[in-house]
Regions:
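N-terminal small-residue-enriched
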Residues: 1-245
């Protein structure tokens, strides 16, 4: 069944299945608290297929008005925009000075602490999915058999950021291009690269919204950080969904 996600749910999908997985300290195995490590392998950088050609992810700490925008990170590195996924291919990571030196990449200016007495660590900035050219109406109208889901209710993902299940507050059955009924407690499951590889429609700039979270936890002792996740609605083909009428 085809799955259509509205922007706020897609923002959490980005956070959990992309954002934490591309933190370089997790990729290197230095950090595992709360979110585990990562399925990504640095030897596959610029080769690994993360998703379909519609998938363009950037980490941009310079984005005006977004939740994780700043001038300099807590190591004094200027804020910047880094390409993370380009046309479906994994091209970048979230890094600081130490992790970048080990990996042989340019420091990304992505190290922050939630207070002066805390150790700075790699954190997501504004990790967003660049908009496409469709609209939500067009996506629904072109869907023969699917579910449109809105507003997160629950999430679960393994410690490699691969296998996941998400639940939403409300879902709408879509048949032959029309919404025909509401469904309760809709859920969907997937495996990260296959899920993103099935993205075949993506709404444009008019529906691109600066979503995010003010309370992303990481580290031991725990620290809380702001993360931004700009996104617009998208469709994912052949997704395993569960609904209750």
């Amino acid at each position: 069944m085809d799955l259509i996600l509205e922007g706020s749910q897609l923002a959490l999908q980005i956070h959990e299945s992309v954002g934490h997985a591309i933190e370089l300290d997790r990729i290197l195995g230095w950090e595992a608290a709360y979110a585990g490590t990562s399925h990504l392998d640095l030897t596959k950088l610029n080769q690994h297929k993360y998703g379909s050609e519609l998938m363009n992810i950037v980490a941009d700490a310079t984005l005006p008005g977004a939740l994780a925008t700043f001038k300099y990170d807590d190591e004094g590195t200027p804020a910047q925009r880094v390409d993370i996924v380009k046309e479906g291919i994994w091209t970048g990571v979230l890094s600081g000075r130490d992790s970048a030196a080990v990996a042989g990449v340019k420091p990304g200016g992505m190290v922050r602490a939630d207070g002066f007495g805390r150790l700075p660590m790699v954190r997501m900035t504004n990790v967003g999915l660049l908009p496409g050219t469709s609209s939500l109406d067009e996506i629904i109208q072109s869907t023969e058999d699917g579910v449109y889901m809105e507003t997160n209710r629950s999430w679960s993902i393994d410690d490699l950021r691969l296998n996941f299940q998400f639940g939403c507050e409300v879902g709408w059955l879509v048949k032959n291009g029309k919404i025909i009924d509401m469904v309760k407690n809709p859920t969907y499951t997937g495996i990260t690269p296959q899920f993103w590889g099935n993205m075949d429609m993506l709404a444009g700039e008019e529906e691109w919204v600066f979503w995010g979270t003010p309370n992303c936890g990481k580290g031991q002792p725990s620290q809380v950080g702001h993360t931004g996740h700009p996104a617009s609605p998208a469709r994912f083909k052949e997704t395993r969904v569960g609904v209750r009428g």
